[in-house]
Amino acid sequence: DFAVGLSRQLHGLTMHSERPGHRMYEQYHPLGVVGIISAFNFPVAVWCWNTALAWICGDVCIWKPSEKTPLCGVACQNIWAEVAKENDLPEGISCLVNGDFTVGEFLTQDERIPLVSATGSTRMGRIVGQKVASRFGKSLLELGGNNAIIVSDKADLKITIIGALFGAVGTCGQRCTSTRRLIIHDSIYEEVTSKLANAY
């Protein structure tokens, strides 16, 4: 939905100039090829989020899924191929390359790929960001976080315990938005920790 909404907003801007009889305007142009490196968790969602935005902006995508989820990549690519064929879209709008980290390195170093979007660990993001920056490319990095929940003395503890527990262990904790720590008001600390321990 966000990508479809964005498609109606890619019209550029026209501005007045301080020079009489002149106007300034900006235009949006496709980058060309977007490289997508996704992690093992949420492989389909991450691919969809990235490709939808790239396609709306007129770009084509090369997707390198995690070596732990290659079949997700193959399945998505097959579904996309059917959709593209049914709608008379040319081949090559979406490409798939499976392999280990060396395949990702090729994407980060290839100057024909102006933008690389990578989802994964902070360590991986640091490597990808530096390699892409060294060739003056652009990178979008969604990396592992250290997310906190702040629990005030006025918090609804029933909802807080459910949210904290699900945030920490939902999907086995294998997501970048997992709750890693709680910041609890002193006056309710004992009550919250006791309820949380019992919830486990």
Give the predicted meaning of each segment.
Residues R23-M24, C95-P114:
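A structured beta-alpha segment of the ubiquitous adenosine-cofactor-binding alpha/beta core
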Residues C48-G104:
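PLP-dependent aminotransferase-like
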Residues L6, I37, D100, T119, ...:
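Conserved residues at the C-terminal ends of beta-strands
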Residues D1-T51, E86-L89, I93-V97:
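N-terminal Rossmann NAD(P)-binding subdomain characteristic of aldehyde/semialdehyde dehydrogenases
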Residues E82, Q109, L115, R123-Y200:
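ALDH superfamily catalytic-core signature
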Residues Y28, A45-C48, P70, V74, ...:
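Glycine-rich phosphate-binding loop at the start of an alpha helix
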Residues F42, K68-L71, F101-V103, T122-R123, ...:
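Short alpha-helical
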